UniProtKB/Swiss-Prot annotation:
Tissue: Expressed in root nodules but not in seed.
Stated role: Probably participates in a plant defense mechanism.
PTM comment text: Contains 3 disulfide bonds.
GO-annotated biological processes: defense response
Stored InterPro entries: Cyclotide, Cyclotide_bracelet_CS, Cyclotide_sf
Domain of life of the organism encoding this protein: Eukaryota
Protein name: Cliotide T17
TM stretches of this protein: none
Entry comment, domain topic: The presence of a 'disulfide through disulfide knot' structurally defines this protein as a knottin.
Keywords: Disulfide bond, Knottin, Plant defense
Per UniProt, location of the Cyclopeptide (Gly-Asn) cross-link in this chain: G1-N31
Organism: Clitoria ternatea
Disulfide bridge partners, by residue number: C5-C21, C9-C23, C14-C28
Protein family membership: Belongs to the cyclotide family. Bracelet subfamily.
Length: 31
């Protein structure tokens, strides 16, 4: 929840989700 993964999740889920990233405020974050 604190480190940006450099990915947007406005239209599609976080591809970086496989690395532990999750969607928050339309941006993918790690932890």
């Amino acid at each position: 929840g604190t480190v940006p993964c450099g990915e947007s999740c406005v239209f599609i889920p976080c591809i970086t989700g496989i690395a532990g990233c999750s969607c928050k405020n339309k941006v993918c974050y790690l932890n």
